[in-house]
Each structure stands twice: as C-alpha cells, then as structure tokens.
Regions:
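ATP-dependent carboxylate activation and anion-phosphoryl transfer catalytic cores
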Residues: 2, 20, 24-25, 47-50, ...
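Glycine-rich phosphate/diphosphate-binding loops that line cofactor/substrate pockets in enzymes
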Residues: 43-47, 271-284, 304-305, 346-353
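Short hydrophobic/aromatic-enriched beta-strand-loop microsegments
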Residues: 1-3, 325-338, 407-415
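Short internal beta-strands
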Residues: 285, 308-320
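Glycine/threonine-rich flexible loop motifs
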Residues: 295, 361-375
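Active-site rim loops that border cofactor/substrate pockets in soluble metabolic enzymes
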Residues: 282, 318-347
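C-terminal functional extensions of proteins
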Residues: 389-428
Length: 428
C-alpha cells in the first residue's frame, strides 16, 4: 500500500533525487555530499558563501546550519558529523533574498492533486515550521506559479507517488529551484486542507487504499479569500532561549486564520498566536545592525511615523532615521546601563509596545560581540515582558501594512463553514 519504499528513498537520498531532477530538467541549488572539512571548504569557495549544511535524513531541520564564512563552516560541519556520522553531510548553496514556496498534494500514480501553493512571508532561511504562510501566494508571479505547478506534477509522477507529498521550492529572480520533496503528510497539510475545503488526509488515505482522486476535484478554484498560518512559540517558558529564527525549527504550535484579504488574515492569525500588535498607536523600538539593514528599515519607519507611532532607537539607528527626516527618541543600549533613557528600563516599565529587531548576519558575530549580546537581551526582555517582537524584515513590513488595513476597515469574523459555503465543493 502507498508509495513504494524505493521511491521514498529516491526522494530522501539527495544524490538519487538530484539525478531525477536533472532528468526532468528541473533546477536545484548547487550541492555536494562531503565527509571532510577540506572538501567542504573547497566546495564553499567554489559556489560562494553562504552555504547550508545538513546531515541526511533529518526532521525539523535538526543540526542544519547556515554558514557565512570558513570558521562557522568548520564549526557547523563538526556538529553535523557528530549527529549523523554514518552518512555524508549535504552542503548546499544558500540563496539570500529568495522566496520560499511549497506545495502540499496527493498523487494516485496517474493524477496529481495540488492542494495549494503556499508562500512563506519571510524570505528563505526560516524553517517551514516557523514560517508565516499565505494561501494564495502574494508576491510570486503567475508565470512562477505555473512553473511550480508543472514541476510538482512532473516530480510526483516520476516518483510514482501513491499518497501524500510536499515539495519545497526557492524562487530567485523568477527562477524556480527545488529544495526537496517529502513523501509524507507535512505539518502544513491540515492548514492547506481547511483553507481549500478539501481534506487532503482523507484523499491520501483513500489513494493509499487503492482509490483514485475524483476527477471533479482536479480543477476546483481557490476560495475568494486569503488564509494565513502563523507559528506559536514557547520562548516565555524557555528561560534564556533566544527568540531568533533560522533553518532549525523552534515553534511548538501553529494557528491559521482566514480573512477577506492578506492584511486581514495576517492580523487575525497574529492575534490568534497571542501576538498583541498595537493597532491604535504607541511606541515602537527599532534596533537593526549594519548600514544595509538600516537602509532597508527606513521605508518601514516612515510608514510607522505616518501611522502616528513614536519611534525609539539606539544612537546609530536614530542617526540613520534622522538623515531620512524621521524623528526618533534616542535610547541608550543595554550595555550602557545607568545612562537614561535605557532600553532595559523602557522595556521593564512597559513604555515599548512593539520591538522590531533585525539581527546581524552570523558572519559578523565575532566582530560585534557586544552588539549581538545587546540584541539578544532586547529580544529576550521583550519576550519576558510579553512585548511583541519581530525579527524579520518581510514580516515587519506585512505587519505594518496590516495595522494600516485594520484601522481603515472593520474586521469581519466568520466561521470556517461560512467561508467554505462560498466554495464550489467541500470534500471533507
């Protein structure tokens, strides 16, 4: 019953799956399976940093790391080998500023049903279990969506899947690359099922038992609404844990909400995840490292000012904002304790309503150790005092747009059944 074990291994074994993608003429990030530090360094020098290091056969991104330079690569490789010494470590070129998209579906060996194409709000580099997701995709083009549908069909049929599957993609400059294909029910499948009104788990079980996908389901349109899946974390219960996200999964749960449009659904999902975003105004602390990040946060700060928020910032960030005619209240850094007003003091006294802290890349941690410690303390204190903290630029932009949208139009609450009643068919 179900997908043959050899086909599952073909998808899980990076070398075999890579060969299949080459045969299908489908792009993938450059990669290699290596066993020594010397080989890894040589490969990294060839393709360029950053690179992603991961052991074979892992779940939830266990032992996965992004390496930005030779030193962090050696440290990461040592960790990966200790986790899975029997298998070569897979090292892959890591794309910065790429979008991540995935598909959940069911195949009966002849027909491929794509439940939904799901776009991550955050750029690639955040584990799918920690990512905020949107159905339908909000930023990728129709051309890219068509290509993803085509690739998904080709992969599912080539693997002779009988049951559920999940395919993850990278989108960079309109080029589509396959990350991996999992021949199982993914954690996002319940979310996709409720969004579509089609129970993919039921469909997969029927196929595994020898059934076929009903033809009438193949071309059903999406509903005229947007659904968002948001992660939930337990950082408040994990003393001293850094609430920062990466390729290794940190979330302990998730919520999903449906709205009339993207901002509506996002705000509902954040509220459901106990993230108390200030809607009516307040004080926002912006703390970012490096000139590039400061330049990227300028448009967000302008939107916040236009919405009536008061911006607090440390000295360098304040200077960058002032250069762009954005007023900000200066706060002294955490390690400058005793100087007032200080970040720690403002967080403790509840004078900050939301924190936007975009961390520095790993590659500069050694150079800016004090700054990194400050950033950690800001994030940690925000969690301890139940202050919303956003550590991703794309999510910050989406949240600010959602605040504006929520002010302009009344939020409508509907049951899942009410949304499903607008669909052509519900298969549950």
């Amino acid at each position: 019953m179900g997908t043959h074990g050899k086909r599952i291994d073909m998808a899980e074994n990076r070398s075999k799956f890579s060969t299949l993608l080459d045969q299908l003429n489908i792009k993938q990030p450059e990669w290699n399976a290596l066993t020594t530090s010397e080989e890894a360094i040589e490969f990294a020098q060839k393709v360029g940093y950053p690179i992603l290091v991961r052991p074979s056969y892992v779940l939830s991104g266990a032992a996965m790391r992004v390496s930005y330079d030779e030193k962090t690569l050696k440290d990461t490789l040592d960790l990966a080998v200790s986790v899975s010494s029997e298998y070569p470590v897979v090292i892959t070129k890591f794309f910065t500023d790429a979008r991540e998209v995935e598909c959940d579906g069911v195949c009966d060996g002849e027909n491929v049903f794509i439940g939904a194409i799901v776009e991550h709000i955050e750029n690639a580099g955040i584990h799918s279990g920690d990512a905020t997701m949107a159905i339908p995709p909000q930023t990728v083009s129709n051309e890219v969506i068509s290509k993803i549908e085509d690739y998904t069909n080709k992969i599912a049929l080539a693997l002779k899947i009988f049951g559920p599957f999940n395919v993850q993609y990278l989108v960079k400059n309109s080029e589509v690359y396959v990350i991996e294909c999992n021949l199982r029910s993914s954690r996002s499948m319940p979310y996709v099922s409720k969004s579509r009104g089609i129970n993919l788990m039921r469909l997969a079980a029927e196929v595994i038992m020898g059934g076929k996908i009903p033809k009438r389901l193949m071309n059903l349109p999406l509903g005229n609404y947007v659904s968002i899946k948001a992660p939930m974390f337990s950082f408040m219960r994990l003393d001293k844990a850094d609430p920062i996200l990466g390729v290794e999964m940190s979330s302990t749960g998730e919520v999903a909400c449906i709205g009339e449009d993207f901002p509506d659904a996002l705000m509902k999902s954040l509220e459901a995840a106990d993230m108390n975003v200030p809607i009516d105004g307040g004080n926002i602390l912006i703390s970012v490292g490096g000139d590039e990040l400061k330049n990227q946060v300028i448009p967000l700060a302008k939107k916040l000012k236009n919405l009536g928020f008061t911006i607090f910032a440390t000295e360098d960030t304040k200077k960058a904002l002032n250069k762009n005619n954005i007023e900000a209240v200066k706060l002294y850094k955490v390690h400058e304790y005793g100087m007032e007003p200080n970040i720690m003091q403002c967080l403790q006294e509840g004078r900050i309503d939301m924190v936007i802290n975009i961390p520095l890349p790993t590659t500069v941690k050694e150079k800016f150790k004090t700054i990194m410690e400050d950033e950690y303390k800001i994030r940690r204190m925000a969690v301890d005092y139940n202050i919303p903290v956003i550590i991703n630029l794309q999510l910050a932009k989406a949240v600010i747009d959602a605040i504006k949208n929520t002010r302009e139009k009344k939020v409508k609450i509907k049951s899942l059944n009410e949304y499903h009643q607008t669909l052509k068919e519900v298969y549950w």
